[in-house]
Amino acid sequence: MKSGRFIGVMSGTSLDGVDVVLATIDEHRVAQLASLSWPIPVSLKQAVLDICQGQQLTLSQFGQLDTQLGRLFADAVNALLKEQNLQARDIVAIGCHGQAVWHEPTGVAPHTLQIGDNNQIVARTGITVVGDFRRRDIALGGQGAPLVPAFHHALLAHSTERRMVLNIGGIANLSLLIPGQPVGGYDTGPGNMLMDAWIWRQAGKPYDKDAEWARAGKVILPLLQNMLSDPYFSQPAPKSTGREYFNYGWLERHLRHFPGVDPRDVQATLAELTAVTISEQVLLSGGCERLMVCGGGSRNPLLMARLAALLPGTEVTTTDAVGISGDDMEALAFAWLAWRTLAGLPGNLPSVTGASQETVLGAIFPANP
């Protein structure tokens, strides 16, 4: 069974940077050693945003974007190796999620697409890469997402305490770690995505630092109710979503009924949308004693305060409190999934994704010996 140093690479739907994590992994433990966040050039970020919202590309443009993202991920890995004074031979493999650009797990031909050419990463780092983690699960009838609940269960499940892990990235997803029950998990809806998109358009800021804009505004209740009527929120699990659904166009369609509103009030309403849709799903799933939050949203003081207020009797904390950096959780999970793949172990949970069976995930891109 392969064990040793692994690197996880994650570029999420929030597009706030490439997260790279170095960890030692074996069958008994996952020990994080180092991490860094690598910036995404504005031009690349905009290209990804455009394709996620349905802008048409030529095959040439699509191929160039795939190559550029692969090079970006390789640069991020090499920066971490240099910082840690490590060589390619010191790393067993890289687990790279890729950049999600489309996710459509239902319909006549279900599919999901994460780009960033893994061959570029192998060529530029000299390290074996495991990628394309989601499509095997979809081929077996699953949603292909979320995949991180399996990792949350391995690290954070408790024998008697009802726990849930909440990742608030661009999309928010919930892992249900309830003693005596199969692991559950699904996307609750928008996390930071709509909040980030709004303040980017209104103020040219990548995100609402310390929720300053949202805290200066007031929730527009009719707008909130209008957004909460979206059928995704009442759809039963298993379910997953992404930027191709909850994007700026989605927000604009709801705002048409509310002309002339204060931009800060919209920001406050979007924060409340995220908090309400998460808390409703926690309660509908039977509630928990401890909700452990990770991802960029765990740094949003307004979101954390609203979750605590909407979930009385639940201890709302961050995964940092149990020794796992909330900023690095997803990248660490894909390092672990790479280890599972090389060990020939399944990486999905049918109770989460709805797949017909457990399966080894991903494709292996071997480095030269």
Swiss-Prot record:
The keyword Transferase is assigned to this record: yes
Protein residues bound to ATP: 12-19
InterPro entries per the UniProt record, alphabetical: Anhydro_N_Ac-Mur_kinase (IPR005338), ATPase_NBD (IPR043129)
Enzymatic reactions: 1,6-anhydro-N-acetyl-beta-muramate + ATP + H2O = N-acetyl-D-muramate 6-phosphate + ADP + H(+)
Disulfide bond entries: none
EC number: 2.7.1.170
GO molecular function: ATP binding; kinase activity; phosphotransferase activity, alcohol group as acceptor
Pathway it works in: Amino-sugar metabolism; 1,6-anhydro-N-acetylmuramate degradation; Cell wall biogenesis; peptidoglycan recycling
Keywords: ATP-binding, Carbohydrate metabolism, Kinase, Nucleotide-binding, Transferase
GO process annotations (BP): 1,6-anhydro-N-acetyl-beta-muramic acid catabolic process; amino sugar metabolic process; peptidoglycan turnover
Family named by the database record: Belongs to the anhydro-N-acetylmuramic acid kinase family.
Protein purpose: Catalyzes the specific phosphorylation of 1,6-anhydro-N-acetylmuramic acid (anhMurNAc) with the simultaneous cleavage of the 1,6-anhydro ring, generating MurNAc-6-P. Is required for the utilization of anhMurNAc either imported from the medium or derived from its own cell wall murein, and thus plays a role in cell wall recycling.
PANTHER family, per the entry: ANHYDRO-N-ACETYLMURAMIC ACID KINASE
Protein name: Anhydro-N-acetylmuramic acid kinase
